[in-house]
Amino acid sequence: MEEAKVPMVELGPITFNLTLLAVCIVTILLIFGFVFWASRQMTLKPKGKQTALEYLISFVNGIGEEHLDSHLQKSYSLLLFTIFLFVAVANNLGLFTKLETTSGYNLWTSPTANLAFDLALSLFVTLLVHIEGIRRRGFGAYLKRFATPWPMTPMNLLEEFTNFLSLAIRLFGNIFAGEVVTGLIVQLANYRLYWWPIAFLVNIAWTAFSIFISCIQAFVFTKLTATYLGKKVNESEE
């Protein structure tokens, strides 16, 4: 299968992937639109859209409660909720449609099917976790943890790097593989007309499975974020 081309624009030394930029904006707008719509006209007895929103908030809060001290959980609940929604929506964007120009440029994909994006997202989480650890504990006390006991310092530093790398690669591998298989199913439908009914049924089953996997990956990413954050800010970890 040929590698899809994407439109690029260069601003000085930086090259921007316009498709990736566009789908990231779409992801943000979808999340903002859903939360804005679901939070309008809220009542004491939730129903419909309000129930869905409150369930998502409660679900993500449960992740935070497992890994963060009780007095810290509220401080990071919005962060974890935003990360979960963003990753869940971004994972699923590329499953439902495929947009390509006649010249072969891909105009639609899941942001998380791009390794550079996943590395950037993982770097954001990693930096945020360390910044919060320093803010809560103080710079000296925070650095001391990496040298306690001092023979383990190289292993402690290596662990931080592998956490960053695995967070990105795990997400990329699952979402990219899902889009590749979806593309192969579409090619099967285009190969012969009589393959179309089979490809259609297979695509429905695969899309449903991919949605499930995408949501699981959003859960895993959020849970690992909460785990790494808890190790850095919890008083019980001192």
UniProtKB/Swiss-Prot annotation:
Main location: membrane
Transmembrane segments: 18-38, 76-96, 114-134, 166-186, 193-213
Protein keywords: ATP synthesis, Cell membrane, CF(0), Hydrogen ion transport, Ion transport, Membrane, Transmembrane, Transmembrane helix, Transport
Keyword field contains Transmembrane helix: yes
Annotated compartments: Cell membrane
Gene Ontology CC entries for this record: plasma membrane; proton-transporting ATP synthase complex
Single GO MF descriptor: proton-transporting ATP synthase activity, rotational mechanism
Gene Ontology biological process terms in this record: proton motive force-driven plasma membrane ATP synthesis
Pfam families: ATP-synt_A
Membrane topology: Multi-pass membrane protein
Record note on quaternary structure: F-type ATPases have 2 components, CF(1) - the catalytic core - and CF(0) - the membrane proton channel. CF(1) has five subunits: alpha(3), beta(3), gamma(1), delta(1), epsilon(1). CF(0) has three main subunits: a(1), b(2) and c(9-12). The alpha and beta chains form an alternating ring which encloses part of the gamma chain. CF(1) is attached to CF(0) by a central stalk formed by the gamma and epsilon chains, while a peripheral stalk is formed by the delta and b chains.
Protein family according to the UniProt entry: Belongs to the ATPase A chain family.
Record's function text: Key component of the proton channel; it plays a direct role in the translocation of protons across the membrane.
Protein name, as recorded: ATP synthase subunit a
Source species of the chain: Streptococcus equi subsp. zooepidemicus (strain MGCS10565)
Lineage: Bacteria, Bacillati, Bacillota, Bacilli, Lactobacillales
Gene designation: atpB
